[in-house]
Amino acid sequence: STGTITRFRDTRDPKPRGRNIFWFYRPETLAEWLQKDKSLRTRLLDIPVLNEAGLRPAQIKAVKNLEQSFKKNKPKALIQMATGAGKTFTACTFVYRLLEHAKAKRILFLVDTKNLGEQAEQEFMAFVPNDSNRKFTEFYNVQRLTSSYIATDSQVCISTIQRMYAILKGEELDEGAEDTNPNESTWMEQQRNKKQAMPVEYSPKVPIEQFDFIVIDECHRSIYNLWKQVLDYFDAFLIGLTATPDKRTFGF
């Protein structure tokens, strides 16, 4: 670390290479990692072949390509699927596989409206993996954030990007801020006008290693400007989901 830029390299990785991190990890996190024989990036290589039963061709392609991207240690991936192609079901499928086979600790599912968060929660609650006859929620805890509290026993956290931004800023979220796309709401304008709206600073309550993966739903609306700070804060693989990417989205 130079005091301004901090880089980290895990020599247990298949092809160790440094990466920039927002802040350094907690000592207890490093101690926990040292007790494990394999790093997350090594465990990603151990993900078994996908069981294709019950999946559409587009869903199969998306999951396979995503996992191949992870195995190449690419930090970002973009999944483009047409509306109605089962984007959230696809997300449930690869989230399950990351938790079950790569032993991911916690995954953040980011949306930009409360309604989309509720829909995602219902999808996860109804999801039954094709290698089991039990529901996903019988294996893993799903929490939709309605306050700043992130349960320590949750494996999937669903949150609006507005709420996660407010959590990192240590601020209360305005009532109604999650009801509409923030880029079209007065709340976004209020944040821009605040003298201390930027930048996000390190929060000991939410360490950078809180999530191993971040799934960004409707990412064509949520990966720029104010919101990019949320994505840059965490040391996590990023997975963008969209049906309507633009040129900036492909640059993600």
Tell where the protein language model's regions lie, with residue ranges.
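Conserved structural-core and active-site-/substrate-pathway-adjacent residues in large, well-folded domains
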Residues: T2, Q59, G84, T113, ...
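Signature of the SF2 helicase/ATPase Hel1-core->accessory helical subdomain module
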Residues: Q162-F252
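Short amphipathic alpha-helix with an adjacent loop that forms part of the alpha/beta core around
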Residues: Y149-I150, K205
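Acidic/polar loop patches that form or flank catalytic/metal-binding clefts of enzymes
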Residues: D131-F139, I239-G240, R248
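Conserved SAM-binding loop
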Residues: F109
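Conserved helicase motor
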Residues: K114, F136-S147, I161-A166
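ATP-dependent helicase/translocase motor core
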Residues: S1-R106, N115, Q119-D131, T152-V156, ...
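Short beta-alpha junctions and helix-cap segments that line functional grooves
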Residues: F94, E123, N141-T146, N225-W227
